[in-house]
Structures are given as structure tokens and as C-alpha cells.
A protein has these predicted regions:
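Catalytic core of the metallo-beta-lactamase
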Residues: 10-12, 133, 144
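Active-site neighborhood of divalent metal-dependent phosphoester bond hydrolases
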Residues: 43-47, 52-132, 138
Length: 152
């Protein structure tokens, strides 16, 4: 069976409740269609759960896209003056991300040991841009939002 969900936004308890509703077996696949992170308090918990389950296929959402360059900068241990050392583009990326709910993700990410931070970043980097399935002779595209400049 193939399942899909999206826009979990750090809501681990709601995610776990949904997972209890899905009889996800070893031969089943769950596509998570983006926006796992931000807004809610438990983005890292959800990402770790997904990492531990190879039949969960993550698709990149706009929140992961905003988070990724910032999280890469947060992998090393932070030093005094961290913000002053950032380029103006990096500061702008952080500002945009925090305005879109990234603060909870940053706080949670910084509590992780450096090695776990690195693993989280590598995992998000592995997110697909889309999935494509053929079911009953129908072709289905699994994406977060839309395909820009798409034409048949």
C-alpha cells in the first residue's frame, strides 16, 4: 500500500496519531510530502522517526528548503559573535526562515549533539524533489506544492 501525508510542521503527537491509523508494514511506503519542520516543537523527533524507517520517503517542502542552508551553518559548535560572522545573505536566510516558523526548529536542533546535527542535515539533503508512481495505469506525481513552469 502507498500512503501520503504532508505539512506535519513539527507536530510529533499528531504525526504519531496518524501513524497509528496507518497499518504501515514492511512492504508499504509512506511519502511525506514536505514541511516536516517548523512551527511545532518536535521537528527533530519527527525527522529521527522518519530516518529510522526506510519505507518513509521524504519529499522536499519549502520549509525544508528554507531550513537547510541555515541548519548547515548551525552544525558546528557556535562561538561568540556567530551572527556577526554571517554574510548578509545568510542573515537574510535566517530572518526569512524565523519569520516562517523556524525558531522552534533552531532551538530543537541546537540541543542535539554535533554528530546528530550532521546526520539531520544529511538526511534533509537526501529529500527528493518529487516522487512518481504508476498505479492502475495512472501516473501520479508526489510533490509538496506545485511544478513551476510545468507543461505537458
Amino acid at each position: 500500500m502507498i500512503y501520503a501525508m504532508s505539512d506535519i510542521h513539527g507536530q510529533y503527537e499528531l504525526f504519531r496519531n496518524l501513524m497509528e491509523q496507518i497499518p504501515l508494514g514492511k512492504d508499504d511506503t509512506l511519502y511525506v510530502l514536505g514541511d516536516v519542520v517548523d512551527r511545532g516543537p518536535d521537528s527533530m523527533k519527527i525527522l529521527k522517526y522518519m530516518m529510522a524507517n526506510p519505507n518513509i520517503i521524504p519529499i522536499m517542502g519549502n520549509h525544508e528548503l528554507m531550513a537547510l542552508p541555515c541548519l548547515k551553518l548551525l552544525v558546528p559548535e557556535l562561538s561568540n559573535g556567530f551572527l556577526h560572522k554571517l554574510s548578509s545573505q545568510a542573515r537574510q536566510s535566517f530572518a526569512e526562515w524565523t519569520l516562517n516558523g523556524g525558531i522552534s526548529t533552531i532551538q530543537e536542533f541546537l540541543k542535539l549533539p554535533q554528530e546528530e546535527r550532521r546526520q539531520i542535515v544529511e538526511y534533509i539533503e537526501s529529500f527528493r524533489l518529487y516522487g512518481k508512481k504508476i498505479i492502475n495505469n495512472g501516473e501520479y506525481w508526489l510533490i509538496h506544492a506545485g511544478l513551476e513552469h510545468f507543461s505537458e
